[in-house]
Structures are given as C-alpha cells and as structure tokens.
C-alpha cells in the first residue's frame, strides 16, 4: 500500500516545545446541567447503542447468507458481531506523532494512550463462499476545521490470516493520513522529521478501497489510531470547540456469482 511504514520507536516531547503544546478536553455535562466549555472532542456516536466512543465499525448486511462478514476484537472470534464500538471519550493533549508507541498494532480491542485513541479489531469471512468487500473510513462529523490538525494512522492487513494456507501475516504496516496542507494546493502535510502524510481520499473520507478474493475463514486485521498533531501549524486556538467523529464501514460488493 502506498505510503506504508513500519512502526517507529517511541519518543518523549520536551518542555521546550510547550509553546505549541495546547491541551484539548472533552465536554463534560455537569449534574446541574451546566456544560463545561469544550476544547476538542474526539469521538464517534455509536450506531447501535447511541453511546459515545472513539469510532464505530459496522458491516452492511448482505441478503445472501452464503456471504457474511463478522467482526471481533480478537482473532479467535469467540463473540462475533456486526457492529463494534470503541467507548473511549477521553481527555487528550496534542502530541508529536513521533511519540506514539511502536506496538499499537499488537494489542487487541481498545488500547488508548494518554494522548491518543487506538482500537484494534478483526474482520472475518464467516460465509461459505468467496467475495470482495469495500471498506471506507469516514469523517462523519467535523466542526471548527479540527480535521486540519487531526492525524489518522491505519494499520490494515487484508489477509492477516489466510484460511487456505493457515498462514498469519504479522508484519503490521501502516499509513498516516491527514488533510492536505492548508494553502498547499493539494500538497500533503509533512510532520517532523520528514514524515510525509497521505492525503485524505476526499472531503469526508480518510481512505477507502476494495479487497478481492476474500475466502471463507480468511481474516483481516485493522488498527485505527487518532491523535492531534501539535507540530501542525493549524494546531492553534482557532480549533477550540471543534468536534471530530469517525466511522469505518465494510460492505460485500462482489461475489463469485457476479
């Protein structure tokens, strides 16, 4: 996949960078009903339960039961579902993306850090026939141009497990996505040191694509990481009050009968 990178070592930010280091907090409704002034919320409304979370993953139903996708927070699929919700709604501080740990793709389910949101899940062909599926990582809500400083890292291994051979792919490559550079005529953001971001696919879409040849028993692995990049020139007080919401959708679109 274009722009894929392997995990980098974790670093720490120094106090000398505090000038560009602003704190963003979520809205906290008080018991009295008074709403504290918000800075930034990074959340997604759960499509199933109406609760808040970091993001929601959903599989679109396919009428033929021979073609089925299930989701799980582990590759054992002991409790397969069609909707997953990361329930984190946490305070975060903008950070240098170089500070992210290198094991983000090694922990299942929700594994948020102090200054980032991370969620790992699996997608399995639980039907009886081979098919293709589309995936789309959507920005379903955004205000105050907060997306100009948000970064989304996607670890995506379409054939993490291949049922036919029984082989697992543990490499864990990733791509970092960002909105094109402000005033850059479509040029990508470049974060220190020389970390070139991949532009969002389009307005409202981080990335999308199609996976072909997904056979019964095959498993895909996905890790989504969200943070606010403190090195971005757009990471200013102008973002105060912004909201950001992600959904990831999967849909069966091609079968061996097509």
Predicted regions and their residues:
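Short, polar/proline-rich extracytoplasmic segments that appear immediately after membrane translocation
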Residues: 1-100, 109-110, 244, 249, ...
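Generic structural motif recognizing short loop/turn segments at the entrances and edges of beta-strands
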Residues: 5-10, 51-55, 63-67, 74-80, ...
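Residue-identity detector for threonine
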Residues: 14-16, 23, 56, 74, ...
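Extracellular adhesion/glycan-binding regions together with long Ser/Thr-
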Residues: 17-32, 96-106, 110, 163-219, ...
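Surface-exposed interaction patch
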Residues: 20-25, 29, 38-69, 109-185
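C-terminal, structured domain-capping segment
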Residues: 99-133, 138-140, 196-258
């Amino acid at each position: 996949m274009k722009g894929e990178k392997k995990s980098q070592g974790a670093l720490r930010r120094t106090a000398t960078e505090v000038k560009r280091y602003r704190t963003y907090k979520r809205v906290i409704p008080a018991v009295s009903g008074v709403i504290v002034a918000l800075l930034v919320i990074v959340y997604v409304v759960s499509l199933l339960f109406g609760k808040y979370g970091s993001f929601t993953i959903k599989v679109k139903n396919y009428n033929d039961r021979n073609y089925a996708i299930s989701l799980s927070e582990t590759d054992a699929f002991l409790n397969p579902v069609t909707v997953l919700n990361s329930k984190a709604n946490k305070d975060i501080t903008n950070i240098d993306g170089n500070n992210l740990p290198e094991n983000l793709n090694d922990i299942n389910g929700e594994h948020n850090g102090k200054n980032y949101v991370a969620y790992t899940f699996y997608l399995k062909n639980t039907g009886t026939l081979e098919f293709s599926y589309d995936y789309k990582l959507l920005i379903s809500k955004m205000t105050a141009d907060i997306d100009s400083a948000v970064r989304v890292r996607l670890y995506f291994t379409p054939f993490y497990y291949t049922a036919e051979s029984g082989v697992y792919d543990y490499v864990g490559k990733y791509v970092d996505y960002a909105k094109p550079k402000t005033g850059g005529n479509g040029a990508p953001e470049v974060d220190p040191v020389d970390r070139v971001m991949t532009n969002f696919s389009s307005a409202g879409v981080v990335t999308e694509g199609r996976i072909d040849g997904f056979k019964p028993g095959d498993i895909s692995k996905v890790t989504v990481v969200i943070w606010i990049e403190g090195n971005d020139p757009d990471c200013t007080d102008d973002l105060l009050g912004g909201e950001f919401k992600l959904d990831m959708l999967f849909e069966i679109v091609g079968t061996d009968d097509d």
